[in-house]
């Protein structure tokens, strides 16, 4: 960290409201009274081609996955007002990200939106340095909390490759279709929306299995969202790959699942 960063005042950007609240706690510990803004959409899945132009395809994507509050959904995906305000705000911007694909993509996108103001953009990249047993994909502030945020504050730096990151975002955004996106060796890899179906089926391949346990095993291993897995389970049941029984649980899934053909 260069000395020129010591006395700056920032507006802080994060992914999702939970992380925003934890960052506010972090800043209080650091003695900093600064604004925190959450940019909420989970960019690691779904279409991206119009995400910076109203995000109608993302609205349709989340509706397909079962989001029912359409007004809240529209506010969730269309964040143009946030970026418009940041471009006219004289303060420097601090991005908080990690190796989680949602946060990696968020940081690339922020560089694209603020590409005309490259000297204003800084970052804190969370790692597992405080908790080495946690994989970097899960070493995000929203999981590890304020203690880790405080420990990483001294690692903050100005982003020097804003143009390159903006170009990478444009390339990723231009790829049409519904995709899952993973971060491998620092690069975004595109996968089909059914990429984790086999893991879900394997989790139910021996007997009737609690559906929450089935999705929990995948979430514990991979940085993938619950809403996607819930949608995939309904698709697999509809297509006859999984059998279901019992009432709908609190996550909107059948209580129990079993792979087709398994004798319980």
Give residue spans per PLM region.
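A structured, charge-rich N-terminal accessory region that forms the first stable segment of a protein
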Residues: 1-74
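Short, cationic-aromatic polyanion-contact patches
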Residues: 247-264
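Short helix-coil junctions and helix-kink-helix linkers
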Residues: 213-226
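Short amphipathic alpha-helical interaction segments
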Residues: 223-238
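A short alpha->loop->secondary-structure connector
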Residues: 31-33, 109-121
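A short, conserved structural fragment
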Residues: 237-248
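Long, hydrophobic/aromatic-enriched structural stretches that serve as scaffold segments
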Residues: 65-108
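A conserved mid-domain beta-alpha-beta active-site/ligand-binding segment of alpha/beta enzyme cores
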Residues: 137-209, 213
């Amino acid at each position: 960290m260069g000395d020129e960063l010591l006395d700056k005042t920032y507006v802080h950007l994060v992914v999702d409201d939970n992380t925003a609240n934890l960052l506010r706690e972090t800043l209080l510990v650091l003695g900093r009274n600064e604004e925190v803004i959450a940019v909420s959409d989970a960019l690691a899945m779904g279409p991206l081609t119009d995400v910076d132009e109203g995000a109608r395809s993302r609205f349709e994507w989340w509706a397909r996955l079962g989001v029912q509050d359409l007004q809240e959904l529209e506010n969730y995906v269309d964040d143009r007002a946030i970026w418009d305000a940041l471009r006219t705000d004289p303060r420097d911007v601090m991005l908080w990200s990690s190796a989680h694909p949602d946060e990696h993509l968020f940081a690339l996108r922020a560089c694209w939106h603020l590409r005309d103001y490259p000297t204003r953009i800084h970052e804190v990249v969370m790692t597992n340095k405080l908790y080495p047993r946690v994989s970097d994909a899960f070493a995000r502030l929203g999981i590890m909390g304020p203690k880790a945020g405080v420990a990483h504050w001294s690692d903050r730096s100005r982003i020097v490759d804003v143009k390159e990151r903006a170009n990478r975002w444009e390339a990723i955004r231009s790829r049409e279709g519904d995709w899952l996106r993973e971060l491998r060796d620092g690069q975004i890899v595109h996968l089909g929306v059914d990429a984790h179906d086999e893991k879900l089926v394997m989790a139910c391949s021996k007997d009737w299995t609690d559906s929450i346990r089935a999705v929990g095993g995948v979430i514990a291993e991979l940085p993938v969202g619950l809403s996607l897995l819930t949608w995939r389970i309904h698709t697999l049941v509809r297509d006859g790959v999984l059998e279901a029984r019992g009432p709908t649980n609190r996550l909107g899934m059948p209580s129990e699942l079993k792979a087709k053909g398994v004798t319980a």
